[in-house]
Amino acid sequence: MATKMVIVVRTDLDMGKGKIAAQVAHAAVSLVLDILNSSNSLWKEWLYKWLEEGQPKIVVKVPSLDELNKRYEKAIELNLPTTIIQDAGKTQIEPGTITCIGIGPAPVELVDKITGDLKLL
């Protein structure tokens, strides 16, 4: 079973490269911390497998908040580790703006049901 983490970023916000990098990092760290603090043994199994595999991370894009929310809701429905990132609003965008979501680490075939059709950022 191969695993991966996917971060889905909104492109309608016109964030700079550094801002996007920070938001993606927030999502990745948040996912790992959420799993470590969770009682979900399956998620922890996926996390440890992902760590053994070299922590594959993929960053993809969506054009809108609506599309991001659809992906988030589908990940929740499939009971995958999922996080949603809201910006603090200290630099480029308004406080509370949802910038990206993170999904996984989880089996590739499950994550691909949600993000497999999206283009790389």
UniProtKB/Swiss-Prot annotation:
EC number(s) stated in the UniProt entry for this protein: 3.1.1.29
Single GO MF descriptor: peptidyl-tRNA hydrolase activity
Listed InterPro entries: Pep_tRNA_hydro_II_dom_sf, Pept_tRNA_hydro_arch, PTH2
SUPFAM superfamilies: Peptidyl-tRNA hydrolase II
GO terms classed as biological process: translation
Cell location: Cytoplasm
Pfam families tied to this protein: PTH2
Coiled coil: none
Entry keyword set: Cytoplasm, Hydrolase
Catalytic reaction annotation: an N-acyl-L-alpha-aminoacyl-tRNA + H2O = an N-acyl-L-amino acid + a tRNA + H(+)
Gene Ontology CC: cytosol
Function as written in the Swiss-Prot or TrEMBL entry: The natural substrate for this enzyme may be peptidyl-tRNAs which drop off the ribosome during protein synthesis.
Family: Belongs to the PTH2 family.
Protein name: Peptidyl-tRNA hydrolase
Taxonomic source organism: Sulfurisphaera tokodaii (strain DSM 16993 / JCM 10545 / NBRC 100140 / 7)
Lineage: Archaea, Thermoproteota, Thermoprotei, Sulfolobales, Sulfolobaceae
